[in-house]
């Protein structure tokens, strides 16, 4: 098996066919809707809240609301429906999550997107939840994860998942690799490639994104969407706490399996970090769009499809060369 990660890969340029980078179309169709970018902020409590979800939906970006305030999800779906915006929530697999599905059914509410979000998504509990959602809310687009292997992709798709989310512990706030010895840290991009080759439906590459160019690499190796945590955690709209240390502004960023999120030190596989403050999220999204337009121009096309066929090289150590 060929193993590599984002820092080990460089894409090889093709002849540019557009007059200006601005001609490149970065939009993507996902689940019956078209979004401006193939990126989605991580569904983590320190990355997204209801206010940011509304802003993203209003401005043409995909989002997935986190599941860590379970009592608010029903009202969140109701509010988004009333606003005429896309509704996208996360659920787990415990008994109370089934009750939420029942409440939505009873109220005649179908979220546009439901993401089944647990650390090890290749599980019977996830398959059972897919079956339940598809039986009772058949029009919802179901994303299931997180997973790491082609077998997992095939089984979750066969169960009814409309998309799968790939990545076990490659993110900055995750320490699954250290606590358990398992995961895709260090080979996340190769895992995306393996899973995409097996997939008949879209996949979301989740975790390990350190630079904007990693978005293009994810698309090259088969991702329809790219989930990003740390790069989206430092904005004025980010829910994490603001801190100033030695006159430098930071935002708090913590993993979904961290003691901070759990409220107790039990089965901890995440950590609490500080990330530099980055201002308005709109500026970051604009920069990502511009960089992705440049990527498309290097690929020799005018849309994301051009990225999927470019050649690449694997370098020995890292493309950063000490930078």
Curated annotation (Swiss-Prot):
Catalyzed reaction equations: IMP + NH4(+) + NADP(+) = GMP + NADPH + 2 H(+)
GO process annotations (BP): purine nucleotide metabolic process
Keyword Ribosomal protein in record: no
Keywords assigned by UniProt, alphabetized: NADP, Oxidoreductase
Active site: 174
Principal EC category: oxidoreductase
MF-aspect GO terms: GMP reductase activity
Residue ranges the record marks as coiled coil: none
SUPFAM superfamilies: Inosine monophosphate dehydrogenase (IMPDH) (SSF51412)
A Pfam family that the UniProt record links to this protein: IMPDH
Entry's EC annotation: 1.7.1.7
Residues the entry annotates as binding NADP(+): 203-226
Superkingdom of source: Bacteria
Gene3D superfamilies hit by this protein: Aldolase class I (3.20.20.70)
Entry GO CC: cytosol; GMP reductase complex
Family from the record: Belongs to the IMPDH/GMPR family. GuaC type 2 subfamily.
PANTHER family (alphabetical): GMP REDUCTASE
Function according to Swiss-Prot or TrEMBL: Catalyzes the irreversible NADPH-dependent deamination of GMP to IMP. It functions in the conversion of nucleobase, nucleoside and nucleotide derivatives of G to A nucleotides, and in maintaining the intracellular balance of A and G nucleotides.
Protein name per Swiss-Prot or TrEMBL: GMP reductase
Organism (species): Oenococcus oeni (strain ATCC BAA-331 / PSU-1)
The gene coding this protein: guaC
């Amino acid at each position: 098996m060929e193993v590599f990660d984002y820092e080990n890969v460089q894409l090889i340029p093709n002849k540019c066919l557009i007059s200006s980078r601005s001609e490149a179309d970065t939009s993507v169709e996902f689940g019956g809707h078209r979004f401006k970018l193939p990126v989605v902020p991580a569904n983590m409590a320190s990355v997204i809240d209801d206010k940011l979800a509304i802003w993203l939906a209003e401005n043409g970006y995909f989002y997935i609301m986190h599941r860590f305030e379970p009592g608010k999800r029903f009202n969140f779906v109701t509010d988004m429906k009333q606003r005429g915006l896309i509704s996208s929530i996360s659920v787990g697999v415990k008994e109370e999550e089934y009750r939420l599905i029942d409440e939505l059914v009873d109220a005649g509410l179908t979220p546009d997107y439901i993401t089944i979000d647990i650390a090890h998504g290749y599980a019977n509990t996830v398959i059972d939840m897919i079956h339940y959602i598809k039986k009772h809310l058949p029009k919802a687009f179901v994303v299931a994860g997180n997973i790491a292997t082609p077998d997992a992709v095939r089984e979750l798709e066969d169960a009814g998942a409309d998309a799968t989310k790939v990545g076990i512990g490659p993110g900055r706030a995750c320490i699954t690799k250290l606590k358990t010895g398992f995961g895709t840290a260090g080979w996340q991009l190769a895992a995306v490639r393996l899973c995409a080759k097996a997939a008949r439906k879209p996949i979301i590459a989740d975790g390990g994104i350190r630079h904007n160019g990693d978005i293009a690499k994810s698309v090259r190796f088969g991702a329809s969407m790219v989930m990003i945590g740390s790069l989206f955690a430092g904005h004025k709209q980010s829910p994490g706490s603001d801190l100033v240390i030695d006159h430098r502004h930071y935002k708090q960023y913590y993993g979904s399996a961290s003691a901070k999120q759990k409220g107790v030190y039990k089965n901890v596989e995440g950590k609490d970090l500080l990330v530099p403050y980055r201002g308005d999220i709109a500026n970051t999204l604009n920069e990502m769009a511009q960089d992705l337009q440049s990527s498309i121009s290097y690929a020799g096309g005018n849309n994301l499809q051009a990225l999927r066929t470019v050649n690449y090289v694997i370098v020995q150590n890292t493309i950063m060369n000490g930078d």
